[in-house]
């Protein structure tokens, strides 16, 4: 089945490409989603008239994704997890946890856009990819820390402050 793509489709092509796909993929996904139209002489003429409008829309989406990429890459995402002996995590850091941590910093990202080969199971800093657009992928630094570290670090600054008040 020959189709004209009306948008960039991952692993298939970009706006304006004439592609040959299996009939089921075209009928059940691309056509109902408005991502493609049947490649006929009449549709080619119609598409050429729509091309500039569609291209402007795609460029606007790409620019918005690049702005979001800059905001995401500037974030310091810290996830506190419970650990056991030898700094081994109880459970793992999944896309849902990362998505919630990013949302807590004020940027909403759909967890399905977070790309991970496997859940994070170790402490430390891990780069996590977020697909914002077919051509824009942000690398977000995610730091996984122990919940024991955060409790140990907090009381230390309070002790000198209490001593200073007692000295007065």
Swiss-Prot record:
SUPFAM superfamilies from the UniProt entry: L9 N-domain-like, Ribosomal protein L9 C-domain
Region: Disordered, residue numbers: 149-168
Any single biological process term in GO: translation
InterPro entries: Ribosomal_bL9, Ribosomal_bL9/RNase_H1_N, Ribosomal_bL9_bac/chp, Ribosomal_bL9_C, Ribosomal_bL9_C_sf, Ribosomal_bL9_N, Ribosomal_bL9_N_sf
Gene Ontology terms: cellular component: ribonucleoprotein complex; ribosome
Gene3D superfamilies tied to this protein: Ribosomal protein L9, C-terminal domain, Ribosomal protein L9, N-terminal domain
Swiss-Prot/TrEMBL keywords: Ribonucleoprotein, Ribosomal protein, RNA-binding, rRNA-binding
Biased composition (Acidic residues): 152-168
GO molecular function, one term: rRNA binding
PROSITE patterns, per database record: RIBOSOMAL_L9
Pfam families (alphabetical): Ribosomal_L9_C, Ribosomal_L9_N
Stored PANTHER family: 50S RIBOSOMAL PROTEIN L9 (PTHR21368)
Job description of the protein: Binds to the 23S rRNA.
Entry similarity comment: Belongs to the bacterial ribosomal protein bL9 family.
Protein name: Large ribosomal subunit protein bL9
